[in-house]
């Protein structure tokens, strides 16, 4: 490296996250796209409230994939699954897979939910807006759940199922994406409870 030349850090040494744009203004401050080589902070951002927003989106996805019973605590294995899935996404869509992940998160996070309100012994559902942080958490959970359910008792690997889920969610395809289907279901229930 020559003097004065900038060091370019790419995710897994392959993908640049500086060109990725977040279209949803409410999620801009909650989606971290800081350049990292390997998305592993070893829990540094779990001490304070809302510090998880400083964590790279791919690491948050890895943490949600680790929450399943099979992959609990196996971060290296999950990161290799995500790397393989991002390679499949890049080959299939011919665009930056980190952009596909961000688009999938924007399309699969519900904007409206219901909460249970008890008034005078009578309980009913009330529609409420969802905070951007909860919206992202729900999107991560549904994407990882859709991928693990797709791979369960299937010939497809978890990486292929994750790639399918990310591509379908980035296109907001309700027929193929578990996460988008769940989002639409929650918003439909919330709309009926207005």
UniProtKB/Swiss-Prot annotation:
Coiled coil: none
Any GO CC annotation of this UniProt entry: small ribosomal subunit
Molecular function as annotated in GO: rRNA binding; structural constituent of ribosome
Assembly and oligomerization: Part of the 30S ribosomal subunit.
Family: Belongs to the universal ribosomal protein uS7 family.
Function: One of the primary rRNA binding proteins, it binds directly to 16S rRNA where it nucleates assembly of the head domain of the 30S subunit. Is located at the subunit interface close to the decoding center.
Protein name listed in UniProt: Small ribosomal subunit protein uS7
